[in-house]
């Protein structure tokens, strides 16, 4: 699904929520944790500015990286369905909407198409991730995340390739270090102080 379509859908939903004034604004700095379920209330969040990670509650693994504009919590219905939390990466602005207000607004404003578009986009991301993690080959998983990281032109200048991969997998640091070192020696990638600065076509097998 085209990124532009996702962005338009998110902007449309955020615009209607702002007009309805059915939210409270959260302004947070980086490295803050925000829950989807708090004080017996389910929340949906509109990311109006900044960057966040969606992390699993069970093991703190990053399952998604989001940049504004975006919507968080479309699949959340009650506390039994909350498996993730938000961790901010940068300074952010989030519009927090109670579950009942969120779906009432979707119904009244006929925003089901936008909600569907964003849900499908997130499902596709999850399918791609799960397909990569289904591989029993550690190198195959590392290769997958190197390719993803390389496509994130702005982010790769700020983040370490080590932390990017380690936060998204259960691969040991020693195993990852060996693979990255061998790829550097083979001339497939180039790193400086943990930053990925160049990448050639990676071998399919290792």
In which residue ranges do the predicted regions lie?
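Residue-level signal for tight coil/turn positions that link beta-strands
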Residues: 49, 90, 192-193
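Cyclic nucleotide-binding regulatory module and flanking cytosolic helices
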Residues: 1-33, 71-72
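Polybasic "coupling" helices that flank or enter modular domains
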Residues: 113-171
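Glycine- and acidic-residue-biased ligand/ion/polar-headgroup-sensing regions
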Residues: 41-58, 68-70
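Cyclic-nucleotide recognition modules
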Residues: 63-119
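Phosphate-/nucleic-acid-contacting segments
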Residues: 147-206
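Short beta-strand segments in beta-sandwich/barrel cores
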Residues: 25, 34, 50-56, 93
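His/acidic/aromatic-lined binding-pocket segments of jelly-roll/cupin-type domains
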Residues: 25-26, 35-37, 41-47, 63-64, ...
